[in-house]
Amino acid sequence: MYAKTFGETVCGINGEEIIVEVDISNGLPGFDIVGLPDTAVKESRERVRAALKNSGLMFPMTRITVNLAPADLRKDGSSLDLPIAVGILTAAGSLLQEEAEGKIFVGELALDGSIRQVAGVLPMILYAREHGWREIYIPQGNAAEGELVDGIDVYTPASLSELVSHLKKQERLTPLPKIQFGTETAGCGDVDFAEVRGQQVVKRALEIAAAGGHNVLMVGAPGSGKTMLARRLPTILPPMTEDEILEITKIYSIAGLLNGKKQLVLERPFRSPHHTVSASALIGGGSVPKPGEVTLSHNGVLFLDELPEFSHPGGLLRWRTNHLPQPLEDGVVTISRVQASLSFPARLILITAQNPCPCGFLGDKVHSCTCRPHEIERYRRKISGPLLDRIDIQVAVPRLEYDDLKDKTEGESSAVIRSRVVKARGVQHKRFEGSGVHCNAQMNKKQLNKYCKLEPQAEAMLGKYFAALGLSARTHDRIVKVARTIADLEGSAAIKAAHIAEAIQLRTSVQR
């Protein structure tokens, strides 16, 4: 007997339809799965066998062959347990083929027949809806993801026996209700810029970074507030749109970072990996490529604290910095394997922080630096030029003065700063509408020439400093992009000399 059911797996950040073909024939009892299954899929034989038996359902004691198509796509994870079990029941005659038709099944089977939660269900549901499927069956543990997608009926059977009863119309399940999240907005979280004392220049730099999507390097002594400032950047970024919310929630679903309580990622991500993070954990990778910290920071902030310390033995930072410029430039991480080449989104703001020297006190007003010149030079050379070239704003973070620390005057709140950022982003949204560009930092050369018109005085100033400081062509373009953002914050159509002066200061204030 032959039967066909449908399941799904995850490929990159999207679902991929899998055809599950089951053939039961005479011969010595056996259970084979073909079609490039990984270890987890091969192990489903024992899970399916035990689940059927412990659910009071018949497991055929004959030869069973399961084919997972397309055969050239590697299947990983345990989400195919459920369609395999339904396929066996259909081929054995316990279910009719029409009872399983027009439905997609996703879930891992426990040995007692219950259906366990799996990662990546949200992109699977979205794929099913986009390709015309009307029904999908997922674990109850993934119900929160099922409530996010309308236009398709999502069912959550607790067990295999409950699913069979529903398919036979003996006991009907109710599709999940849909939630409305279009009007939900995230707050500013538990931290706020109003808590930051002093550091007006750095706060201004972060406001410009948020408004234009620019990358930032902060250099300062230990305890100067670099980490505190970086953690408050997401609180001034614009609220995410519905599409951005769904996109980042998809990524977190694939990474297994959603739970029953957290069904939507409403706040922009802030990721801060330790400097011992592996290359594949940072960029993404693995034998079956999975998203790394760069992709988990999509639509948000990636913070690399103590940047030179990422260069632990093995030269890992050099490996990373040879790969980081590509996603920073393109907004996409591409990972190539023998079976396939996968792309993960990586449109983010990179915030980095470091000490000015190994001891941390070079230029400090209180402590004396104990480093030798060659030690300082070696410390700075740990960070590659290509990465530094793509950091638009490089700003010094001075030690906080006692008077600033004890000042009881509350600074501007994140909400106030965010309102200015949102207004500037609105100007950019209108400017780049339909182009695929979201903010000034992403402009290409053609857009730079079109939208960044400098007044004569601004042009003269930029030319003067370009020659005096020996700036590169890329640095020139990035200064102009930052100046464009400053002009947007001030509501100016043209880029003025004051905008160029501030952009140059933000780029060149840190001595390298």
Predicted regions and their residues:
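Peripheral, non-AAA+ core regions of ATP-driven protein-machinery
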Residues: 1-217, 221-227, 476, 482, ...
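Short beta-strand elements
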Residues: 18-24, 282, 392-395
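Basic, amphipathic alpha-helical bundle interface domains used for macromolecular binding and assembly
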Residues: 40-45, 58-60, 67-77, 288-289, ...
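Short loop/turn elements that form and flank the Walker-type P-loop nucleotide-binding site
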Residues: 59-62, 99-100, 132, 150, ...
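P-loop NTPase nucleotide-binding/switch module
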Residues: 171-208, 212, 239-295
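Walker A/P-loop
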Residues: 217-259, 330
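Walker B catalytic acidic pair
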Residues: 299, 305-307
